[in-house]
Amino acid sequence: MKKRDKMKMMGILILLLAVITVAITLILVSRLSKTAGKDQKEETFDRSVSGMLSNAYILKSEEKDIIVLYRGETYFAEGKPEKKYTGVADIELTKGKVTKIYAKPSTIKGVLTSYSSKSVQIEGYEPLSAEKDLPVYLVASSGHAKIPVRQGKISDLVVGNSKVELVVAEQKACALVSYQEDMAEKVRVLLKNGKENTYASLFVCSGDAYTVDGNKRKKDTVTDAEKLLKGEKTGKEIKISPDTGGLLYRCDKNGNPYGSGYEGDLILRKEKKGYVLVNEIPMEDYIRYVLPSEMPLSFSYEALKAQAVCARTFTYGQMKNDTYARYGANLDDSIAYQAYHATTSYEVTDQAVADTTGMVMTYKGKLADCYYYSTSPGYSENLEVWNAASPGYLLAENHTREKTKDLSLLPATPQSIQVWRQAAG
């Protein structure tokens, strides 16, 4: 047989093996009995079924009463478990019965700081490679919940906020379990380097004392990302925290600041193409800086309050956005999200934020989609601008008192041309 024919035959065998594996898995799932209601008859597995269900969630395991959550569905099964167990496990089936439950009690507890399609990271730990289609189990905080555990997606969790248990086996992430519905208290803002997400070099300083991963540093000391992260693996994070009331600055190697300082913590993260800089800041403080970046101080106080509510609603709506999850951030500081300039805060905007603390807009019990623009001729648009279907509250309307004039029909005058040239610079 020629070498080319051997290669072809080997490829066919590998493909055939993959098809058989998928077929067995589908048969296992199809033979399970879904629970559809209180009065539904409990069925068992087909007696001919044998195999393994990986990373399922055991809801109940008592003699002849085993309930399993697997791939988003709840199933009944028969068997005699060695002991009661609730949690993530591999389940062995033999002739339709549960013959073995391989518990996975090894977990890492902490805050979810980043994730991608291939890895998951918990605060204080290096990223771990993850199972494909990593299962995420959301456990209700109330013991009286109608659905005590449901299967969700990793995007249901909030980077920098969600407290989770990462189930680990053989140094690999097998599943994520979250025991609470997270209301984000902090925002992680990616501080972009122009259009880039990374910096080739990165220095941080402060006019006050500060700490680097808990180690005290004197004021005016420059922290060099390269020195701290040299030799570390991709994904390694270092948290820099100012003393109470202090600010942190991105600076050059001599300690000369670039622009204004940041409240909250700065997180330096090593990536393949350089370093990422993230500002972790309490939600309300973030809104304090967004508000004057998005609306002039000269606007009416009620308008400032309304903008604060819009900004807060928009931010909460973006917390589960996975665009920057791999960098451990929720959003960035550009106008692609909201303008976030760490400039001096102002009393009037600070008060507008304080007077609306925690307030958001909802529609039918869910956060409203808040879209707003910097400049308007008095006519609003709906979501067609973003090639999306518009909800009932986003309408294209004329917001002027009088009918909008068609300015395209007005003749240009020397005066209007001069005004335009001055405005254009």
Show where each model-derived region lies.
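Conserved, single-site charged/polar hotspot
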Residues: 2-425
